[in-house]
């Protein structure tokens, strides 16, 4: 069955413009044809913020109860806590020498980076390499801290960072198709609460305008 056929088959399982409950959306998703690979389950949230205004940015982090199902490779930039970073499970650990290595070969064999504060001036050297890929450690995304161990451990347990895109939307992987409905619901409930907690004070009125649930290859299901 081709991808286009799978998407067509998934569309036959629900009404495109109907808004379902989260439980109903998860039941529909479970019935959809599966791809030959392990698909991610994603939530797409449309907010009412004005993304052009600096005081209306949505940004934060959350440790999903059941993680995302993905093994995350973590790079830890630190001069003083390298042993702690290694013990916490960091895949790549180093200080100035690691910064220099990345500046030379531009290879990024990791999914997320954390750092201790003393490394931030040194990381400026590779900011143009890390930044475009969303890998630059930042206090707002809770990837910079005085203690490196909890930063690494949180990411290994399923911590995710989120922020709005240029359209004021938030996109997040919340699990895999192999997860149970209960696991996906718990992850989603937790993530949505974190989004609500991070509503900008400058954003007035209804914050979340719409939400869509989908897997990598499926059509999107609107839910509330």
Where are these regions (language model features)?
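Generic N-terminal amphipathic, Lys/Arg-enriched alpha-helix
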Residues: 1-15
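N-terminal cationic and glycine-rich segments that engage phosphates or anionic surfaces
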Residues: 1-2, 50, 110
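Translation machinery proteins
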Residues: 23-82
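Residue-level signature of catalytic and energy-coupling elements of molecular machines
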Residues: 25, 85, 131, 213
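Flexible, glycine/charged-enriched surface loops at secondary-structure junctions
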Residues: 37-41, 198-210
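Flexible glycine-/small-residue-rich
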Residues: 47, 78, 116, 174-176, ...
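Long, charge-patterned amphipathic alpha-helical coiled-coil/hairpin "stalk" segments used as oligomerization
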Residues: 90-194
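C-terminal edge-of-domain segments
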Residues: 212-224
């Amino acid at each position: 069955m081709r991808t286009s056929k799978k998407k067509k088959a998934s569309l036959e399982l629900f009404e495109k413009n109907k808004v379902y409950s989260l439980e109903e959306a998860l039941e529909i998703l479970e019935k959809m044809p599966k791809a030959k690979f392990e698909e991610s389950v994603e939530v797409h949230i449309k907010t009412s913020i004005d993304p052009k205004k600096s005081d209306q940015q949505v940004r934060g982090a959350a440790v999903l109860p059941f993680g995302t199902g993905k093994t995350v490779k973590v790079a830890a930039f630190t001069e003083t806590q390298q042993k702690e970073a290694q013990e916490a499970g960091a895949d790549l650990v180093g200080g100035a020498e690691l910064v220099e290595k990345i500046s030379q070969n531009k290879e990024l064999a990791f999914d997320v980076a954390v750092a201790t504060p003393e490394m931030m001036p040194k990381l400026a050297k590779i900011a143009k390499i890390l930044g475009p890929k969303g890998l630059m450690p930042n206090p707002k995304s809770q990837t910079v801290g005085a203690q490196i161990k909890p930063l690494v451990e949180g990411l290994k347990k399923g911590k995710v960072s989120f922020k709005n895109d240029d359209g004021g939307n938030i996109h997040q992987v919340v699990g895999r198709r192999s997860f149970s409905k209960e696991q996906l619901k718990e992850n989603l409930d937790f993530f949505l609460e974190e989004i609500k907690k991070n509503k900008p004070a400058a954003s007035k009125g209804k914050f979340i305008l719409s939400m869509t649930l989908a897997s990598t290859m499926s059509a999107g299901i609107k839910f509330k």
